[in-house]
């Protein structure tokens, strides 16, 4: 790895799926997955259909088309049930919980954002020169309608005013197109899709080594799949011998710390507290835990160790973009943390609901597609031996992905359903001719 660069980003493009793994100091730090058959809603603009306006809950509920959404508060003028409302999706729907949305959305640019439902100008504090700020304000007064708000980012500090004007006019044209789409009716419908994984995470590339690959080969080289599987386990043994038990539930996550196997727990309590703070924060971020998180730190004669653990994990959280909030000790002696839920956890991304080990059928199906591409070379008539569930997934919601695999192979792929195979078992063989 190049000197001074501790972050390594692996990008894998496979049929039906894009995966990104972020390694820090050689260790898996984060995973992002985008599946073509299940596009993300977060960040999209949707013309939703108002289902209910609940004044007693101060909330508005919408049909987003395939998902429900809830808006905290009631916009003015108050929406009519059955009517249309344009909203931006702030968080993905999870299980029975709808997506969180807002009516105060923005159209994002590189140097500026416009807010169609708000008014007024705002210029980044990083743009400090009075002359520059005055020139930008004059430009805004000439270009931006009075009923639209705008925020000028720090990226506009050194650009030519003509470049900024061009971007502002492009954003306004985009908004006009959306309004025409809205007027045409037909809600619920997506007016502006969410940014792709690569667009959304453009900041990844800063101070990082980028490696790109296809069909899972790069992930195998760096043992990423095994590291993901490890992060899905509820029991983790750290390098120091401490055992962490991480129990994820719908409303909260409980983390238990077992020091029984740690020989120097009492001789070096402060050092141990620092090590555990780093490891537990790493696990929380990698697993994408959210909601209420309770940590049971063992009581000891040295109470300073618990306080040191508290201050260390708070320090680490304050320096990380994950935005974990460390509250303090509860009356029962548990350390309470919270994190807003904006998307699925690692378990939600890979495992079946209420299962500790069974992978989603879509995960197995996409892995089968990768295997067909990498291991069918030289087989004239490949046959996928699998469960009925896997076959149904490839011929159903993942049909486009399966068709892409056949196109790349240049041959038809036959199925053989083996009733004795488990949900996640499959293998490839040459089709037997009679």
Predicted regions and their residues:
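Extended, charged alpha/beta regions that create polyanion-binding interfaces
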Residues: 1-39, 44, 94, 102-146, ...
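S1/OB-fold single-stranded RNA-binding interface
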Residues: 2, 7-11, 16-24, 31-32, ...
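Short small-residue beta-strand/loop micro-motif enriched in glycine and branched aliphatics
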Residues: 30-31, 69-72, 120-123, 254-255, ...
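Residues at the N-termini of beta-strands
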Residues: 52, 59, 84, 149, ...
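Conserved glycine-centered short motifs in functionally critical loops
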Residues: 58-64, 93-115, 171, 240-419, ...
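Short loop/turn segments at strand-loop or loop-helix junctions that form parts
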Residues: 77-81, 116, 153-156, 257-259, ...
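Hydrophobic beta-strand segments of well-ordered beta-sheets in folded domains
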Residues: 147-152, 188-189, 206-210, 291-292, ...
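A generic structural motif
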Residues: 149-155, 334-337
